Amino acid sequence: MASREVSTMIKQGFIADPSLSFSPSRISSPIKLSTASPPLPPPPPPPPNESTLSNPTLFDMMSDEHNRELPRRKSHARVAQILTEFKNGVVYGHSLGPGDVKLTVVGKDGYRVTMDVHRKVLSEKSRFFMEKMNSRREKGVSHMVEISECDDLEIYVETVVLMYSDDLKKKLIGENVIKILALLKVSAAISFDEGVMSCLEHLEAVPWSEDEEETVVTCLEELHLPDDSVTLILQRVSSQPSTSSTRTRTDDIFSKLLTGVLQAKDDKARREMKVLIFKLVREEADYDVSRDTLYGLCHRCLTSLVLCLSEVTTQMNDPGKDRGALMGEIAREADNMLWMVDILIEKKLCSEFVKLWADQKELANLHSKIPTMYRHEISKITAQICVGIGKGRILVNRETRFAVLNTWLEALYDDFGWMRRLSSRSLDRKLVEDGLSQTILTLSLRQQQVILMKWFDRFLSKGDDCPNVQRAFEVWWRRAFIRQVLTEPDEPRLQITLY
């Protein structure tokens, strides 16, 4: 092999055995990949303590060893769990037979993990593996591949396991931003395009803390991804666009149970069964309930809610009509809808409902015609959606997030005082305010400005009867003014290099 080619492969992190020879008698062809990253700058020295440094006690040495060993044990335990699920077929449902590649991943601490994987999966999902393994392909020959000096062995193993997933976006729901960035880096390094796109879509949809915000921007700049894939993400923090058969039967039973609860005549029994059914749904969160079943019930609840409000608008001025009964009818229908939203969030199927709720112009119009004391329960649905988005449990695109606030935010402001006073036990005010704040901060800077300037005027007029999203206001202010002022003199432009 030419020395230039060897040098190129070393730079790419793929080092082949010089004695590599594909023949019927040779069963294994070891390939070694090195993923060592440049050494980090040394940490700042601790405060000087001559006696401690020169004569550490036995207790000091044991404490240091314990502090180093505990994180390693936790990481090794998580890796073992991932591998157990992988081997037991929990992570993937493919019938590929025994693996034809032995993949060994070695951490910087020397910990080694070996997995039996499939050339077909590696080659189809990773262009890096495809190029390197196809160039050495010979019938009847298995491979041994080693990835050494891994900064985070757990992430490398999990990324390989994710190649077997049929729904990456769903798999990533609930993961924190730092974990997603780690998966993104490894996916980009091995040209796992589906993994890269799923991580980017996740980052665009979930909120970031201020610390995470800087980490996200830095990471995307370092990875040199194509412009189109990161532009939408970076618009959140920059006003300038970046350049850069049994199942069916079970489903029927589930549908009947939900319908029974929604139509229950006894309120006490209804409340008890709501708690029980939701508890069972939460315990079996991975059970793939038919989306059509859940959304069929959601549409039924929405229709009932619209009809209920239509009737109330014609009857609320009727002196012979019991106003308490009117309020009870609306509260019941709204509570049914809210319960269904909770189930959709738990089943990770709520994205479509957010679009549906944003499109309820007729319902929002009827809502505005009814006194607040009757209608305020409906705004709990909007509040719950914001909490779900704010916690990263509902992933929808930016247009949908803005649309749902555009349709329902004024109603939530109007109803918040009644929600706070009459639902003090069931309404977690801080949770709602945090969820609303985080939802607002996932929008573009211009959208954040439009919403928060209106909120500012409303809050000064209503005080405690308006959700307090001061935290969102502070973050927006720093993004829009302080951050822009600090970067304006140099007129920075994110540079993306295509490889």
From Swiss-Prot:
Keywords: Ubl conjugation pathway. It comes from the Eukaryota. Residues 99-172 form the BTB domain. The keyword Metal-binding does not apply. Pathway: Protein modification; protein ubiquitination. InterPro entries: BTB/POZ_dom (IPR000210), BTB/POZ_dom_prot (IPR038920). One of its GO terms (biological process) is protein ubiquitination. The keyword Nucleotide-binding does not apply. Transmembrane segments: none annotated. Residues 18-30 have a biased composition (Low complexity). Residues 18-57 are annotated as: Disordered. Residues 38-49 have a biased composition (Pro residues). The BTB/POZ domain mediates the interaction with some component of ubiquitin ligase complexes. May act as a substrate-specific adapter of an E3 ubiquitin-protein ligase complex (CUL3-RBX1-BTB) which mediates the ubiquitination and subsequent proteasomal degradation of target proteins. This is BTB/POZ domain-containing protein At5g60050. It comes from Arabidopsis thaliana.
